[in-house]
């Protein structure tokens, strides 16, 4: 009985330690995924959202971005480099044009080409209903670049990948 008791206790201690490490010290991969989850949460909008919630979410969106973020898109008038403040303003303007809005990210493929840099290829889906009653349902493939700054992963580039159609 005593011979079995100590190995069981040792296994339990190791298991608890591994679980604690997984929850208290997430991998870089999980930290990057968390940034996309936060962006999705804060861009999304429910009908009847309060002004306080709108202001909080818009401010929070800005905190996810680096001081400058590049956007590359087939619509050349949208392409360019934007400051964090400009992104916050665009987010405010965009969210007020919708009664409901949902942003989801799928199929995240994350690579770390160098320390402090993450490349992510993913599918983004934006759905919603505008204040004019029009429905939006857009799906795009994106390539994103995140850079680590002061232990936080910040978005520094988004590129919309053009998909060839028949």
Feature annotation, model-predicted:
Residues 28, 35, 57, 83, ...:
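Stable alpha-helical elements in mature extracytoplasmic
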Residues 40, 58-77:
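Short, solvent-exposed secondary-structure junction/capping segments
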Residues 117-121, 133-166:
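Short beta-strand edge/turn micro-motifs at domain boundaries
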Residues 6-22:
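Hydrophobic membrane-insertion alpha-helices, especially the h-region
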Residues 40-47, 65-69, 91-98:
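Sec/Tat-exported extracytoplasmic proteins
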Residues 26, 86-132:
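Surface-exposed, charged secondary-structure patches
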Residues 18-34:
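Transmembrane signal-anchor/signal-peptide helices with a preference for the extracytoplasmic
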Residues 34-49, 86:
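Short extracytoplasmic/periplasmic juxtamembrane "stem" segments immediately C-terminal to an N-terminal membrane anchor
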């Amino acid at each position: 009985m005593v011979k079995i008791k100590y190995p069981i206790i040792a296994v339990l201690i190791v298991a608890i330690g591994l679980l604690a490490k997984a929850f208290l010290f997430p991998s870089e991969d999980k930290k990057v995924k968390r940034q996309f989850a936060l962006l999705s949460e804060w861009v999304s909008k429910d009908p009847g959202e309060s002004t306080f919630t709108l202001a909080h979410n818009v401010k929070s969106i800005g905190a996810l971005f680096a001081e400058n973020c590049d956007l590359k898109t087939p619509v050349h008038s949208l392409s360019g480099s934007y400051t964090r403040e400009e992104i916050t303003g665009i987010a405010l303007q965009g969210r007020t044009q919708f009664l409901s809005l949902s942003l989801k990210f799928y199929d995240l493929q994350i690579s770390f080409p160098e320390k402090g840099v993450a490349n992510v290829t993913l599918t983004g889906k934006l759905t919603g209903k505008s204040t004019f009653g029009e429905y939006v349902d857009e799906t795009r493939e994106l390539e994103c670049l995140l850079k680590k700054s002061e232990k936080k992963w910040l978005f520094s580039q988004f590129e919309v990948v053009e998909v060839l159609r028949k």
